[in-house]
Amino acid sequence: MDGETAGEKGSLVPQPGALGAPALGGAPAPGVRREPKKYAVTDDYQLSKQVLGLGVNGKVLECYHRRSGQKCALKLLYDSPKARQEVDHHWQASGGPHIVRILDVYENMHHGKRCLLIVMECMEGGELFSRIQERGDQAFTEREAAEIMRDIGTAIQFLHSQNIAHRDVKPENLLYTSKEKDAVLKLTDFGFAKETTQNALQTPCYTPYYVAPEVLGPEKYDKSCDMWSLGVIMYILLCGFPPFYSNTGQAISPGMKRRIRLGQYGFPKPEWADVSEDAKQLIRLLLKTDPTERLTIMQFMNHPWINQSMEVPQTPLHTARVLEEDKDHWDDVKEEMTSALATMRVDYDQVKIKDLKTSNNRLLNKRRKKQGGSSSASPGCNNQ
């Protein structure tokens, strides 16, 4: 969005020829999809030039509801199938536990381009790890970490029950509603969210008896992205630094990629010396290198460290100190996780269907033998 016109009434105009939709009256019930309002967002909201954040697909600006004066967050997306998908998935999830609520959606024109404007509750408490970093001398305990992980898990559980994989669960997408002690932690930014009910074998080019097993269950792969993220966030919560890191200064180095793929991380002292074995075991189950072996969200929520979080020991952790000491490198940590998730999404989206020539399939080998070694079969397709 061009910031210089963000605050001017009329910079966003209604879609020509469209009728105004009735007022939403707050967030839709979970799972309900609504049509965007077609009249100008500036009829209902006073827009500000204050940038609150940058989402995957667009800026997030501060705005105020004209009648109530309520401060909200406005995300502008130029219309595209990807933007529509983001709105659809977020709307479907809105109203779910620990998920940032959508208040309104508009379809307007901006500088001659159709755009979608998502008005959301304003998350004034900032990012999860910033809040821990700002605690100073006040100890952050293992029990608090367990309660935070239970809250994040509750959001993921709701999404997965709606057949949505978020696929971008990372520190900057976990925000508090306010600065108050009783603030609620919520998940936002559905720019990479994906429905998990589609069958990958609707791909026009495949041969069922040699398709790779991961292609038969793609929804497990998309959801396992979220489970891996839970493992990384839990690890950082318990010690203040990430399990995988780049030694080269690159956002994601070949060495870091290799450590992620091989699951090479440790629980070094002194930070991990007093952390419970239950917590370490849960991290191991989330950071499994084979996505199909990672815990499901139901298994995660049923783990004693999560479902009995009030009984987790109140052991003081090194987290706040480490986050404060390493705050100059925190942007690098966030960038590394962003890159790692991007790599993972690409890997899972582009799982190869083996080419017939390279497929070691008993039936095909028998057929080839009959044909005297000549391959008359049509080539398979690589979903690259």
From Swiss-Prot:
Modified how: Phosphorylated and activated by MAPK1/ERK2 and MAPK3/ERK1. Phosphorylated and activated by MAP kinase p38-alpha/MAPK14 at Thr-203, Ser-253 and Thr-315.
Q: Single Gene Ontology BP term?
A: intracellular signal transduction
Name the Enzyme Commission number(s) assigned to this protein: 2.7.11.1
Give start-end ranges for motif Bipartite nuclear localization signal 1. 352-355
- Ranges of compositional bias, category Polar residues: 372-384
Main enzyme class: transferase
Enumerate the residue ranges of region (p38 MAPK-binding site): 347-371
Q: Per UniProt, where does ATP bind?
A: L52, G53, L54, G55, V56, N57, G58, K59, V60, K75
Ranges for domain Protein kinase: 46-306
How is this protein's activity kept under control? Activated following phosphorylation by p38-alpha/MAPK14 following various stresses. Inhibited by ligand 5B (2'-[2-(1,3-benzodioxol-5-yl)pyrimidin-4-yl]-5',6'-dihydrospiro[piperidine-4,7'-pyrrolo[3,2-c]pyridin]- 4'(1'h)-one) and ligand P4O (2-[2-(2-fluorophenyl)pyridin-4-yl]-1,5,6,7-tetrahydro- 4h-pyrrolo[3,2-c]pyridin-4-one), 2 ATP-competitive inhibitors.
UniProt entry tagged with the keyword Nucleotide-binding: yes
Which residues does the Swiss-Prot or TrEMBL record annotate as the active site? D168
Q: Name one Pfam family in it.
A: Pkinase
Question: Phosphoprotein: present as a keyword of the record?
Answer: yes
Modified-residue entries (Phosphoserine), positions: S253, S309
Q: Quaternary state and partners of this protein?
A: Heterodimer with p38-alpha/MAPK14. The heterodimer with p38-alpha/MAPK14 forms a stable complex: molecules are positioned 'face to face' so that the ATP-binding sites of both kinases are at the heterodimer interface. Interacts with TCF3 and with polycomb proteins, such as PCH2 and BMI1/PCGF4.
Record-given protein name: MAP kinase-activated protein kinase 3
Which source organism does the UniProt entry give? Rattus norvegicus
